[in-house]
């Protein structure tokens, strides 16, 4: 009778209302289609007819001098002239291969008498003799060819303009200017000593000149630099339009203007504040387990001053690429466990969508030349105490990341009431001190920012900087770009969904066990499932369609396609490993396997666990006359939905889909092979026992591998530990034992009607796992 409701969802998840499907396809098309409109980015709809306005055009002269650049030490590209313009005397150039050739150039000022000077060049203190009795500057080259040799003067350049140029060809030979610019013997000389990858040290400001323009470089050596070093644009436009402006931090500049449209450059200082939010969900049971600690998107509104004007800003922060950790101290109900908790690591990104009420965001639809600069943000985690019923509380504390601005794009920010065209700033995460830990556990010295308390003692995190963009806007400032803007797009669906989850989980205590068992032992169908929710059959059909559409994208539905391959792979992995050794009589199979058997058995444990997770789908797709875990899940869903105060057609499909995937995470499945039973759990436990005496025997991995693909999988509603406990305390017949192993509904109901505490406690524990 295995879970008819979920079986119907699976088989019918691709049969939905045609009108709903057409609407869904239309929405996806709107979302995914991109219209190319030139150099502008599009966020929604373009005007019917528009142009870029008047555009400045003309010829651009190539910039001859690229620079000046600050002093540099690197493997500079070859086949370029590097024109140095030092402001002081001393070493202006050095170069070596650290084995057979050392060279540096010393600038000697005019009218310098002969003297000895000490210089520090290439990590070496050198004494040299300098002399320049003339009225021009002298660039003197000093060279040596062995480490023990002294530097000697080789060539020089006398120039009135304090300029010298260097070039390295493809083989690594260095060329520079020799002679004198005033005596007509200025020439280019080459030191033939190929060193392709040697580092060149330029200790003065320098310019870069293409090798093809060596003649221009020579003219600069002779005549000096031109008066102004900027790119020259020759643009034939009217004097009424042409103007020169210096951009200020907060300014609107009209780039071009036509009758209907104009391009405006917006420059803005910006202060970004954001607040991380999280979901902390406590699992069912005795209060020692947490199912999820995760980040969630969060909105934040604030004000700040910009040039004396108050700015109202709105941000939405979200994360991507988080690392998911877990921690489990053991299988007992009183063992502390965190099933999943998010941590921001080096591979994570933080996205902040920013909007403010300034003119820049009023028409942010067609945008180009978007740039931004922001400072770093350091985020330090705080303390979060896990409130246990008994004993000392574990405390998660510490953790830190540094957010570095990475890029900026356009985005649409959804608030509770409107959608806003925004800027999305992406920050890259880098871990920092201190690490985080959980007191009283093995979790320590881990780096990153956990989601338990990412804000620490901070009210908000803040990043300051500026952005600039060019936007195409209507020429009339009273008009607004015709887009679907400022409409109600959602009424905080996330908040409503959280409230429904909370109400759904709180109903666990109000469910009568006898009523639930009776319901779980009945074959539910789609309409009995929704009968307590919708009043008419037609409404139930529509609601069922919505559930199917949601269920179609669930992990459970997707895993059916890969079921056969997954089970076969699991069986193959087990059969290739060695057979398990006998378990000692004093060792319980419910203790940690790794403490009892060798590392080879760990392979079997891991593979058996993987197979156990797939057994649910295998059981799900085959007929089974006993009670399954999904029958209990469906019964809990139906009972809770009947008690919900608010029924929302948009939210309930999400709840049902989550329930199908998350209810009863700790499951056990068994395969019966004559008088022998093989049982594996999703927690990594595996063992074999006899049906006659419940005595544990050797787990034959090869036989288990043969049974995996062919035998019927049974939900171990009453697991081995519970059956053994029942037999030891009350005694059960062989027939009762076999029916219990097959999860027979009549036998389960009879034990519950007799108020058997062991069976009732087991069922109650399963129901407590039905939380999302």
Curated annotation (Swiss-Prot):
The keyword Methyltransferase does not apply. The record marks 245-246 as: Probable cleavage. The record marks 232-233, 242-243 as: Cleavage. Residues 388-408 are annotated as: Hydrophobic. GO terms for cellular component: host cell endoplasmic reticulum-Golgi intermediate compartment; host cell plasma membrane; host cell rough endoplasmic reticulum; host cytoskeleton; membrane; viral outer capsid. SUPFAM superfamilies: Concanavalin A-like lectins/glucanases, VP4 membrane interaction domain. Residues 247-478 are annotated as: Spike body and stalk (antigen domain). A motif (YGL motif) lies at residues 447-449. GO terms for biological process: permeabilization of host organelle membrane involved in viral entry into host cell; virion attachment to host cell. Residues 509-772 are annotated as: Spike foot. In group A rotaviruses, VP4 defines the P serotype. Belongs to the rotavirus VP4 family. This is Outer capsid protein VP4. It comes from Rotavirus A (isolate RVA/Cow/Thailand/A44/1988/G10P8[11]).
């Amino acid at each position: 009778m295995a879970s008819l409701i979920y079986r119907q969802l699976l088989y019918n998840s691709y049969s939905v209302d045609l009108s709903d499907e057409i609407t869904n396809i239309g929405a996806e098309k709107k979302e995914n289609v991109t219209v190319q409109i030139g150099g502008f980015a599009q966020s929604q709809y373009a005007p019917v007819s528009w142009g870029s306005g008047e555009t400045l055009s003309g010829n651009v002269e190539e910039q001859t001098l690229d620079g000046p650049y600050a002093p540099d030490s690197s493997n500079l590209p070859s086949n370029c002239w590097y024109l140095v313009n030092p402001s002081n005397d001393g070493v202006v150039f050095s170069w070596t291969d650290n084995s057979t050739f050392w060279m540096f150039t010393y600038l000697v000022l005019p009218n310098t008498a002969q003297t000895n000077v000490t210089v520090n060049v290439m990590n070496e203190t050198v004494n040299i003799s300098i002399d320049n009795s003339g009225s021009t500057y002298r660039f003197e080259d000093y060279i040596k060819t062995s480490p023990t040799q002294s530097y000697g003067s080789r060539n020089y350049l006398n120039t009135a303009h304090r300029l010298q140029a260097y070039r390295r060809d493809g083989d690594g030979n260095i060329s520079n200017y020799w002679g004198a610019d005033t005596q007509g013997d200025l020439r280019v000389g080459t030191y033939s000593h190929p060193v392709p990858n040697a580092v060149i040290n330029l200790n003065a400001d320098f310019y870069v000149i293409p090798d093809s323009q060596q003649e221009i470089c020579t003219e600069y050596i002779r005549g000096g630099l031109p008066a102004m070093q900027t790119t020259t644009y020759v643009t034939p436009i009217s004097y009424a339009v042409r103007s020169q402006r210096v951009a200020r931090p907060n300014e609107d500049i009209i780039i071009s203007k036509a009758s209907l449209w104009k391009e405006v450059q917006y420059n803005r200082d910006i202060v970004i504040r954001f607040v991380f939010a999280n979901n902390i969900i406590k699992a069912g049971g005795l209060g020692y387990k947490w199912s999820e600690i995760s980040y969630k998107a969060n909105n934040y509104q604030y004000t700040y001053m910009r040039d004396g004007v108050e700015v109202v800003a709105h941000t939405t922060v979200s994360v991507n690429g988080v690392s998911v950790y877990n921690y489990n101290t053991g299988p007992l109900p009183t063992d502390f466990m965190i099933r999943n908790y998010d941590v921001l690591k080096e591979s994570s990104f933080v996205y902040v969508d920013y909007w403010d009420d300034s003119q820049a965001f009023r028409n942010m639809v067609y945008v180009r030349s978007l740039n931004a600069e922001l400072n770093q943000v350091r985020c330090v985690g705080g303390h979060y105490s896990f409130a246990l019923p008994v004993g000392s509380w574990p405390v998660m504390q510490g953790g830190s990341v540094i957010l570095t601005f990475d890029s900026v794009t356009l985005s649409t920010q959804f608030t509770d009431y409107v959608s806003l065209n925004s800027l999305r700033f992406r920050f890259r995460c880098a871990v920092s001190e201190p690490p985080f830990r959980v007191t009283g556990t093995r979790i320590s010295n881990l780096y990153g920012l956990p989601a338990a308390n990412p804000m620490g003692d901070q009210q908000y995190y803040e990043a300051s900087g500026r952005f600039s963009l060019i936007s195409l806007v209507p020429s009339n400032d009273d008009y607004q770009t015709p887009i679907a803007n400022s409409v109600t797009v959602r009424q905080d669906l996330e908040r409503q969904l959280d409230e429904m989850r909370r109400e759904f989980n709180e109903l666990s205590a109000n469910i009568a066990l006898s009523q639930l068992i009776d319901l779980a032992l009945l074959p539910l169908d789609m309409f009995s499932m929704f009968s307590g929710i919708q009043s008419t059959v037609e409404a139930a059909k529509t609601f069922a369609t919505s559930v199917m559409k949601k269920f179609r994208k669930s992990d459970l539905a997707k895993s059916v396609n890969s079921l056969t391959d997954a089970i076969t792979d699991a069986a193959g992995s087990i059969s290739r490993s060695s057979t398990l050794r006998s378990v000692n009589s004093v060792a319980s199979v419910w203790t940690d396997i790794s403490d009892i058997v060798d590392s080879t058995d760990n392979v079997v444990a891991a593979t058996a666990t993987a197979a156990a997770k797939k057994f649910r789908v295998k059981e799900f797709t085959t007929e089974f006359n006993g009670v399954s875990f999904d029958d209990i899940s469906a019964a809990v869903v139906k009972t809770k939905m009947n008690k919900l105060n608010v029924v929302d057609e948009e939210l309930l499909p999400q709840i049902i889909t989550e329930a199908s995937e998350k209810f009863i995470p700790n499951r056990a499945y068994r395969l019966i092979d004559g008088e022998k039973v093989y049982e594996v759990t999703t927690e990594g436990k595996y063992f074999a026992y006899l049906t006659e005496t419940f005595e544990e025997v050797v787990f034959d991995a090869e036989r288990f591998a043969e049974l995996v693909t062919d035998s019927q999988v049974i939900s171990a509603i009453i697991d081995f530990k519970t059956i053994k406990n029942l037999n030891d305390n009350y005694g059960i017949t062989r027939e009762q034992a076999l029916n219990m192993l097959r999860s027979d509904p009549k036998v389960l109901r009879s034990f519950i009607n007799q108020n058997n505490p062991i069976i009732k406690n087991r069922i109650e524990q399963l129901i407590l796992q039905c939380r999302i």
